[in-house]
C-alpha cells in the first residue's frame, strides 16, 4: 500500500518526523508532498522546495536507520494552484498513484474525502511545540529552536544560513 502525506515543512520538524515514522510502519511506500513549493524567502515560507526536499530526505534516512527498514519514500514538490476544487486532481497528476491519505488538515481531509480517497487522521505530536510558525518565531528571536527539529534538519538550516535569511527578510534589527 502506498500513502500520501502533504505539508509545507517550513521547516520539517519533530511533529512531522513522528507522523512519517508512524505512517512508514503501516505502509509499503510513502509519498511526501511538499506543498507551496513555489514559495520561499518569506517569513511564512523561508525555505526553497529544494532545501525542504533535502531536509526531508535526510530526516527520512534517520527514520529508516532507526526502524531498520528500507521502504521507498518519494519526496515531491507541489506548487499551489489556488483552486481547491481542482487541487486533488493536480496532486494526482504530479505524484505516483496512492491508496490512502494521511492528514490532520481539515481542508486536505475534506478535499481528498470528496474525491473518493481513503483518508486517515494522524496522531498529533505536541502540536503547540511542533508548529512551524512557532519554530520560525524562535529562530527569529534567537531562542532554542534546534530541539524541535531532527538533528539533520538543524544542520541543513545552518548550512544554508537559514536563520540569517529569516532575519534578513523579517526586516528587523537584531
UniProtKB/Swiss-Prot annotation:
Its main location: cytoplasm. Pfam families: CTP_transf_like. It catalyses: beta-nicotinamide D-ribonucleotide + ATP + H(+) = diphosphate + NAD(+). Its EC number is 2.7.7.1. GO terms for cellular component: cytoplasm. GO terms for biological process: NAD biosynthetic process. It comes from the Archaea. Keywords: ATP-binding, Cytoplasm, NAD, Nucleotide-binding, Nucleotidyltransferase, Pyridine nucleotide biosynthesis, Transferase. It is found in: Cytoplasm. Pathway: Cofactor biosynthesis; NAD(+) biosynthesis; NAD(+) from nicotinamide D-ribonucleotide: step 1/1. Belongs to the archaeal NMN adenylyltransferase family. PANTHER family: BIFUNCTIONAL NMN ADENYLYLTRANSFERASE_NUDIX HYDROLASE (PTHR21342:SF0), PHOSPHOPANTETHEINE ADENYLYLTRANSFERASE (PTHR21342). This is Nicotinamide-nucleotide adenylyltransferase.
Amino acid at each position: 500500500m502506498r500513502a500520501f502525506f502533504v505539508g509545507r515543512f517550513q521547516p520539517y520538524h519533530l511533529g512531522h518526523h513522528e507522523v512519517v515514522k508512524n505512517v512508514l510502519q503501516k505502509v509499503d511506500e510513502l509519498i511526501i508532498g511538499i506543498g507551496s513549493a513555489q514559495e520561499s524567502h518569506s517569513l511564512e515560507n523561508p525555505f526553497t522546495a529544494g532545501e525542504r526536499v533535502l531536509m526531508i530526505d535526510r530526516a527520512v534516512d534517520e527514520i529508516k536507520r532507526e526502524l531498520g527498514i528500507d521502504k521507498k519514500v518519494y519526496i515531491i514538490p507541489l506548487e499551489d494552484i489556488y483552486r481547491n476544487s481542482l487541487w486533488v486532481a493536480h496532486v494526482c497528476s504530479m505524484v505516483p498513484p496512492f491508496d490512502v491519505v494521511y492528514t490532520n488538515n481539515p481542508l486536505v481531509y475534506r478535499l481528498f474525502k470528496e474525491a473518493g480517497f481513503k483518508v486517515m487522521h494522524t496522531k498529533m505530536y505536541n502540536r503547540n511545540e511542533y508548529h512551524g510558525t512557532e519554530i520560525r518565531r524562535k529562530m527569529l528571536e534567537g531562542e532554542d529552536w534546534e530541539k524541535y527539529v531532527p538533528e539533520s534538519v538543524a544542520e541543513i538550516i545552518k548550512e544554508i544560513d537559514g536563520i540569517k535569511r529569516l532575519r534578513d527578510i523579517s526586516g528587523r534589527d537584531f
